[in-house]
Design a protein with these regions (language model features):
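Conserved nucleotide-cofactor-binding alpha/beta core module
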Residues: 79-128
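Short, well-ordered alpha-helical microsegments
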Residues: 67-68, 94-95, 143-146
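Short N-terminal or domain-adjacent regulatory/targeting segments
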Residues: 2-3, 8-56, 65
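Flexible, charged surface loops at secondary-structure boundaries
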Residues: 50-54, 79, 127-131
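Histidine-anchored nucleotide/phosphate-binding helix
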Residues: 57-60, 64-83, 87-88
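Active-site and donor-binding regions of nucleotide-sugar-utilizing enzymes
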Residues: 110-178
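Active-site-proximal region of nucleotide-activated glycan assembly enzymes
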Residues: 2-24, 165-195
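Cofactor-binding loop segments of dinucleotide-utilizing enzymes, especially the Rossmann-like FAD-
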Residues: 62, 90-92, 163
Length: 195
């Protein structure tokens, strides 16, 4: 009897998480994605030399600790190429970066997020004021908050890993077949070097 109630509780939680995620994507597509952005995404876009010509990168850092440390290596390699790198990072991860004073940060606090895991209006307005040549979202699993944040920043090129609804947020998507994020980020860096 107890097992059945635990199973139904897990099923209910999974149902509500799925519902919350779908509702979040619906609201994000109607609130944060401008219709002009959607029209522009269908227009042909040249990626020739965009990484070589780019001066500033915003790297949206992942949440898991292992992915975070691998993402720092990725950011370091971009910086070694002479690019100005800013990190979009959650408040609880800032302590890991105190020794990396050569990065600029956009710090995300818990109060910057709604219950549907979307940026609050004030934070979204602040993000719209930011401008970068390239935005790279290093979240491999689905993360609606980071996908929306990557889209709010003023940038011509938005790069992310392929996941559900990613075509709404990124104009360059990388297919990820790796289990280890270090390999995924290395493959992404190799792909970017072609540009």
């Amino acid at each position: 009897m107890k097992t059945n109630s635990l199973t139904s509780l897990k099923d209910n939680n999974r149902f509500f998480e799925t519902l919350r995620s779908r509702l979040g994507y619906l609201i994000a597509s109607r609130t944060f994605l401008k219709k002009s952005d959607a029209k522009e995404s269908y227009a042909p876009q040249s990626f020739s030399g965009f990484v070589a010509d780019a001066e500033s990168f915003l790297i949206v850092m992942p949440e898991s600790s292992e992915d975070f440390s691998n993402a720092l290596e990725f950011a370091g390699l971009i910086m070694k190429k002479g690019k100005k790198v800013s990190l979009f990072v959650k408040e609880d991860k800032i302590a890991n970066l105190w020794h990396n004073s050569y990065y600029n940060y956009i710090q995300v606090k818990p109060e910057d997020m709604t219950r549907l895991e979307l940026p609050k209006r004030r934070f979204a307005h602040m993000l719209r004021q930011e401008k970068f040549d390239v935005v790279v979202d290093l979240n491999i699993p689905e993360n609606i908050y980071c996908s929306v944040a990557a889209n709010l920043v003023d940038s011509k090129y938005r790069i992310g890993f392929r996941k559900r609804n990613s075509d709404k947020f990124y104009n360059l998507q990388i297919i990820n077949n790796e289990i280890n994020s270090a390999f995924s980020y290395r493959n992404l860096l190799n792909s970017l070097q072609m540009f």
